[in-house]
Amino acid sequence: INFIATILKLRRPGLKLMQLPMYCWAMLGTSILVVLSTPVLAGTLILLSFDIVAHTGFFNPSLGGNVIVYQHLFWFYSHPAVYIMVLPAFGLVSEILPIHSRKPLFGYTTMVFSIMGIVVLGLVVWAHHMFTSGTPPWMRLFFTIATAFIAVPTGIKFFNWVATLWGGKISLNAAMLFSCGFIINFVLGGITGVALAQVPFDVHVHDTYFVVAHFHYIVYGGSVFVIFSSIYHWFPKFTGKMLNENLGRFHFIITFIGFNLCFAPQHWLGLNGMPRSCLLYTSPSPRDGLLSR
């Protein structure tokens, strides 16, 4: 609420909304998601606590409750939580790329509207996590379409980032390398996300390592790479001291290669039916998951 109030009401005189840095827009969108989705999770946990401690029947089928209701409430928060983690990274990348490509950010207005589009659509796609939970056909159709549409504002942002780099005087320092690594990883994660939005494919790979790979390409390949990029970009501004660029480039190389060696094979494992969240497997193959290990 403080972020929203500050951005909307406490700007300096003469600073219009469409003149804000992209990171401010990203934090505005993130804050809206937090305000709208987190109370649902809090209420759900309170009801679940009553079920456990006081033996009420909100979600207990033997007492007249419904487990599917719990899933809806849980995912109503937990899918926007992904965007809560990723939207600030979008804002940071939008600040870093223009500096190290020595060009203004391409398509500022469309970047703003794409953030708000992600916020709106991010609140109406939660049930794509529940395609195997007995959801009716009309619900599957709606959430498939809504999930596919969220690729549109996300794609706009990526095209604008590439257009920002195009023709620029790019400095391949550690901050830029990690930002470019983020773009590559997040595009791959986004492609698998569109695939998971399709009901037949999702039913096939649900609860397999394909989902693990998709999640990590979004969260680690997205947010964590941008955290590293931001450290290399702002550390000199915070401290007045430069970090070693050779070590930074080496950090990027081993992180990028190691990350992809770990999680890219998991797509293949999931397509072949390897379930996640299992400690032991009945017929382990020495080849399965060798690189992931």
Language-model segments: residues:
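Juxtamembrane membrane-water interface segments of multi-pass membrane proteins
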Residues: 2-22, 44-61, 65, 70, ...
